[in-house]
């Protein structure tokens, strides 16, 4: 696989922990361990395995040849989606997984942060922007907060001309 390891200023992580701790159901020590383990989500080899097992890099980067049941040759291509991700706030890992897997699809992603985790996604995106602010992956993410169910916001955003799908992490309350 290869790749370059990047030294990251931990001040963004520390700030995220300090701001999240007062509103999180996770005890501060466990929260710190969660944040410390987030780098594992971005392990290159794991991400490459995910791409190959889910769709194949060929389908993300061009046309992937297939053989049909009767031997007929066809091609498939994965198109970058425009997604709204409604994230749960029960663990910083949700933001990390959303960003890592979203980056793999090469789409456009609007992250709706949970009221009890306004800092995990922003910390991760800030670290990515510190590394390369002009990178297409960095520029394809936005993280925002609005109160869930706010018709003035959701009535405008949740339209097919803006986003292809809404991805929801969480329980019944988040889905509604």
Residue ranges and their predicted role:
Residues 62-176:
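Rossmann-like NAD(P) dinucleotide-binding subdomain of oxidoreductase/dehydrogenase enzymes
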Residues 1-75:
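N-terminal Rossmann-like NAD(P)+-binding subdomain of aldehyde/semialdehyde dehydrogenases
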